[in-house]
Amino acid sequence: MHLGFHYHLPAFEENGKIYTIAFQGLFIDSLAEYCDQVTLFLFTPTQAERKEMQYAIRSKKVKLVSLMKHYNIPLRILLYPTIRKQIKTMINTLDILLMRAPTPLLPLITKDIKGKIPFAYLVVGEMSLHVDSIKQQEWRKSLIRQYVNWNESNQEKHAKDGLIFANSSAAFEKYKTLSNNCVQVKTTTLRNEDFYIREDTCLNPPYQILFTGRIEQEKGLLEITEAIGKLHKESIDCRLNIVGWILPKDPTESLIRKIASEYGIEDKIIFHGFKSAGEELFSFYKAADLFIVASQNNEGFPRTIWEALANSVPVICTPVGSISQVLTNEHNAVFIEPKNSESIKEKIKFLIQNPTKRKEIIQNGLETVKEVTLEIQSKKMVDAIKSFITP
């Protein structure tokens, strides 16, 4: 089977190797294992983006069709005719095109390939859920909302003719009414070799609290920092390790440092920067006592939670989006209230002071995540694709 793949995250080729962001590269390599060939239709990164493209795709079955530079969304749409020519050149060689969604050019690409080759969507979220939280002038936000509505309505309209992979229970419930070919999957960066089994954490202070992901206020990082400060006042010694990337001009890091200064805990909040998925990132999970993500908005299930569970780290999280459909409070995670530093403080303290419950959560978490591996999920996807394209 010759699989095509498109998403808006870029990639580039250098010295005979294809480089992209780690979670995308791991996913592509895992698909390639079950395909004859995989052709990537991906944008070319800007110079600033290249430093994040640290994963070299391993499979020799993967080829890259480099699209235009990763311009802003309006410019990509305006210049789409250039991309159309590249896709048309390759279209007859593909058995199916898989698009991770949402992605800006999905409506245009689908329109061009529909009726010519089969297509599939891997639905990992909904842009409309995040428009209101965008920090833009109202007129800009109105334009963004119009674009998002256009993109999502086209995605839903075309779903009836494609194969849909849904990354959450909510997405599955929605798309199974729109498509006769809908499969629920769990996107992940985990391989079988990545699991780290241990019985317990929080054995000695300072307790290592870990956050991984995009550094933004919507992830609850200001409240998490405040909770660490409150624990400090109660003589509970914690370190907050923040691993991830921050968007240009985003004020979150400076606001975190301001709160840390107010509580006198500047030395207890450590920014480690962006780390690639794999051993570099997983070394932080192995050293962590607790993992926390305090998302304030509805979202899909964060793959960072899967990573924490697989590394035997107790998870503290808000039950937003798909999280409450997968995790159960005080069974395989501990829930906190959104935007509530006091709730965060109390749950961190609860896990530190209750080893029996902590061990139980670790074991239940490992049981929850045991089938969320690239080996299992990618084979499930490829098997579904082969069934879909076989008459």
Map each language-model feature to its residues:
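Short alpha-helical donor nucleotide-sugar binding micro-motif in glycosyltransferases
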Residues: 91, 274, 283-288
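Acidic donor-binding loop of glycosyltransferase active sites
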Residues: 95, 286-300, 313
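A short, active-site helix/loop in glycosyltransferases that binds the activated sugar's phosphate group
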Residues: 145-196
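A conserved mid-protein helix/loop that constitutes part of the nucleotide-sugar donor-binding site
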Residues: 207, 216-230, 254
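Nucleotide-activated donor-binding/catalytic signature segment of Leloir-type glycosyltransferases, i.e.
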Residues: 253-275
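Short hydrophobic beta-strand element within catalytic cores of glycosyltransferases
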Residues: 305, 314-317
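Conserved acidic donor-binding segment of nucleotide-sugar-dependent glycosyltransferases
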Residues: 329-330, 334-341, 350-356
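A short, well-ordered alpha-helix in the C-terminal region of glycosyltransferases
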Residues: 343, 350, 357-371, 380-383
